[in-house]
Amino acid sequence: MSDPRKIAYEVLNKCASAEQYSNIALDTAIKRSDLTSPDRGLLTALVYGVIERQLTLDAIIDTLCDRKADDIPPEARTLLRLGLYQLAYLDRVPDHAAVNETVNMAPKRVRGFVNAILRAFIRGGKQIPMPDKREDPIRYLSVKYSFCPALCRTFVETFGLERTEELFLAFGEHPDLTLRTNTLRITREDLLAALAGEGIHALPTKESDVGIRVCDKSPVAELYGFADGLFFVQDEASQLCVKSLDAKAGMRVLDACACPGSKSFGAAIDMQNTGCVMSCDLHRNKLSLVESGAERLGISILQTEERDARTPNDTWISQFDRVLCDVPCSGFGVFAKKPELRYKDPAASAALPDIQLAILKNASTYVKVGGRLVYSTCTLLPCENEGNVARFLEENRDFSLIEQRTLYPDINETDGFFYAVLERVR
């Protein structure tokens, strides 16, 4: 039988060395293992928990350890993070089990060191060192919520200290799985009833009239109706974005940055599978996933094309009733789903607003007069959101703003998300 702690250690080492993103490394490890359902849950909690709490755990290590940070071997740091996370955050794991299992995985040369740090944490009452909020608010946020200082600084400058703390707290919550009903095949009410019949606790989403929140931690592919294409995974914020597109039967719709395809699927379903949805992406291999997803859902009007969304296509000028630009973004609204983003310096995304604007400008040329152009991101940074919409409207008098909206994880119980709806008026 596979050991979930050992697998977690291996996955975390791969993530620490930047070999793989956590979701990919974890999915691969689970598929290769023979873990029971409870052990899969423990493995997932350990991997995501350690990554989400990395800076907090490192602060504990730095307080308890006499060595300089650079003198701690990488494998020892990973083991310490893994053991400390269980001691500090997993009440259901006994202290002795957390210590013994972690120490047993350690190479001989660091076993005593790992054991000493873990036991010192227990002896100290499991106290987490916390900087003073008033004296050093950035350091306080970084240690308490485990976001890199540069990201803390950007959020405080944008939202203020108190609102930043509210957002960081919300980003630490693990959201329910959200599904969009494939109404080509079933109603939301019937799907909810079918899931309940299988013992799955699920609820309708608050705003989207086709969304379902699955409260149980069940693998998507094992849920009732997955193989039959009765639903696909899509956050409620993305569902509302697609709804704002107002795609109707018989229309021509362009999804300029389509992968992984959920917005294209949603538009096609809203169109009752009549008309045309053109789904484009920069990478051919990603488009194959869109095609297989459409096939599972019974969508036949979707076409794919490999292309850079910034590159003009003269044959598409004024040819689409609806155009969606879900542009590449910093992702600073989906920390709960992509925990590695907590440690990304915003400076690394400084070029994104100009890239996003270039995509928006090019895509706008494909919209018919009277048609809609929807711009969306999964970030909360205004420079990628309202700022880009304002820049676009200043230079493009043929469009008017119908609506723009930011959704927040604590207020809307969705991803952090932004969308703007524009209409071509001449």
Place the predicted regions along the sequence by residue.
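S-adenosylmethionine
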Residues: 1-426
